């Protein structure tokens, strides 16, 4: 995997993936775009959400929406590393089985989500979920 990051102005940078997608990052507390740490947090949520939806769809569950609310704690002193991240999944569907959602969240956390599994080496990561009827 390859990517590049180019300075735009101030503390704003443009990241470009090898696949050609671009995203802005901002070091000024997210004034113009997400900060790099916000991007890491969202990457964990996106990676896990992809897994959960994919697992549920493969299990023939009728998923109509999936949202991940991420909360985190960081060290007060520099470097301001994450110390705890919680991923709370809100999965909406028709006749969704609670056990299927629990299994999908567990599989993502323990086996499939590369981002969260990498972060887990240094950060306490927890997962929770709720099932909402469509």
Swiss-Prot record:
Which Cys-Cys disulfides exist here? none
Which residues, if any, are the signal sequence? none
Q: Which InterPro entries match?
A: KH_dom-like_a/b, OsmC/Ohr_fam, OsmC/Ohrsf
Q: What is this protein called?
A: Protein YhfA
Organism of this sequence: Escherichia coli (strain K12)
